[in-house]
Amino acid sequence: MVKTAPVTATSTTTFVDAKHRRRWLICLVALIVVAISLVVANITFDNPMPLGTDGFWKIAQSRVSSIVVMAVVAAAHAFATVAFHTVTFNRIVTPSILGFEALYGLINTAAVFILGAAGATVTRGIASYFFQVIVMVAFATLLYSWLLSSKFTNVHTMLLVGVVMGAGLASLTTFMQRMLDPNEFDILTARLMGNISNANTQYLPYAIPIVAAVVCWLIFHSRRLDALSLGSAVSTSLGLDHRRETIKVLVAVSILMAMTTSLVGPMTFLGFLVATMAYSIADTYSHRAIFPIAFLLGFVLLTGAYFVLRHIFYAQGAVTVIVELIGGLVFLIVIMRKGRL
C-alpha cells in the first residue's frame, strides 16, 4: 500500500504562473503609486500658506489626521469583508449584516432620545467610544457563538438571524427618531452618516494598534483562511477545526467592524466594493494576495472621494456619498450578473 503525504493548507499556490504573479505585482505597485499621489494631493492641494513655512506644515498636519483615519477605515473594512466572505462562502453579503450599523444607530439615537441634544455630546469621548465597541463586539460574538455552537445551525442561519435582528433594531431606531425634535434629529442625522469628520483624533492612539493587531493576525492566518475557503469537509481533512476557526475569524471581523463603525459611522458598501474589485484584480484564492490589494483599493477610494468632495464640492468628510453610490451600483451589477444572492 502506497502512503501519500498529508495535504496541508500551505500546499496551495498563490499564483498560477510567472505572468500571473507579474500582473499582480504591477497592479500592486500601481495602487501604491496612486495612493501616495492622493496622499500628497490631499495634504498639499489648496494649502494657502507658502510651501515649507510653519503655517504650511501646521495645515498639512491637520490634514494628515484625516489620512490616518481613512487608512484605518480602509484596512478594517477590507480585511473584515474579505475574511467574512471566506467563512460565509458568499461574496455578496457584508459584515454589516450582523447588525453593527443598526446597533450603532440605536445607541446614538437612544442617547439623543433620552438626553436631548446633549446626548450627541455624551456619545463622544474615549469611554463612549469603547462602550460602543464593546457592545457591538459582544452582540455579534454572542450571536454567532450561540448559533454556531449547535449542530443544527450553520452560517446561513446565523446570517438570517442577523438580518432579522438588524431589522428589529433599525425599526426601534426609526420609532425613536420620529419622536425627536427637528433640531435634535438634524444633529443625530449628521452622526449617523458615515463621515471622516466624525472621527475624533483622540480615538486614534487606541484604534490604530487594535486594528493593526487584528489585521496582522488575519495576515498570519492567511493559509488557514485559504483552507477555510475550500469548505468544511476539505478544511477538516486538512486538520482544521472548521467551526472553531470560523468563530475565531468572526471575532476578528466583529472587532474590526466595531472599531471602524464607532470611529466614523456606517459605510455599508465600502467593504463589499473593495473586496469585489480585489477578487477581480488578484484573480486568486490566496488571501496573502487579496488582502493588500483590497486595502489599497479601499484607501485609494476613500482618499480620492475625500479629495473630490473637499476641493470640488466643498463637502468635507462626507465620503460615504460617493462610496455608497459606487458600491450600490457595483452591488446591483454583481447581483444581475449572478442572478442570485
Where are these regions (language model features)?
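Alpha-helical transmembrane segments in inner-membrane proteins
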Residues: 1-341
